[in-house]
Amino acid sequence: MTRALTKLEFSLYSLLHLKFGGREFSLDSARWYFSRPMLKKLVFKLSEAGWLKTKKRGVYACETPEKAVSGFFEPKAENALKKSNLSYCFTDASAAEIWSDQSYIQRSWEYSPFFIKVFRKDIKKWRAFLKQNGINFFEKEPANVVGEFIRLKPAEKMEIDEHNGFPVEPLHETIKFCEENKDTFEYVLAYIQNKYGKKTTASEEFLLKAREAI
């Protein structure tokens, strides 16, 4: 997983890539305008961020820009959530995906939100955990965001069901969400009505389409 660089880190990466390309280099050959302590610190951060490869002690090589940038879009949120040791459940559009058995998917590699409900008392723990794991997260609706991220939705209490191995809000809550956002989630409503026998306002056209997926 690649993380974004500071201006100074990116300047050093650019210099290293222009000078060495994919060739190996040592710290001594890259001292130019930086003191040795500062250079060691920056090189460590570049390596930790996924922009440099450590070949052996004190010897590095630049990761290609293409590979480094593609690292921004590597999926890791779901696996991290499983290791959080904190209570949560998928909600809203993420719950719609789960209850529809992924026949409806609202995510893509370039825009991949996960909506999770968490206990309000745990919000500081969630912030620390997600920062530690390098996962982008928001507590309000984000704007101008790409890639994978988690939208935290704090709650005083929550009911957690399980479906296909995922902790998810109860089906009736997902139906309510989909009804309130019917223009986007009518297919999910139709799937739910066909699969679980729950009455919804899905049209016959969508009911027929969803029936084919079950």
Where does each model-flagged region fall?
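Short, flexible beta-strand-to-coil junctions
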Residues: 55-56, 118-121, 178-183
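Short, charged/polar micro-motifs that form catalytic or ligand-binding hotspots
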Residues: 32, 36, 116, 165
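Short gly/ser-rich loop at a beta-strand->alpha-helix junction or flexible surface loop bordering the NTP-binding
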Residues: 58, 71-153
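A broadly conserved detector of short glycine/acidic/proline-rich loop/turn motifs that flank catalytic sites
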Residues: 66, 120, 156
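Short beta-edge/loop segments at beta->alpha junctions of small alpha/beta modules
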Residues: 1-90
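Hydrophobic alpha-helical interaction segments
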Residues: 128-214
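Exposed alpha-helical structural elements
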Residues: 11, 68, 72-76, 94, ...
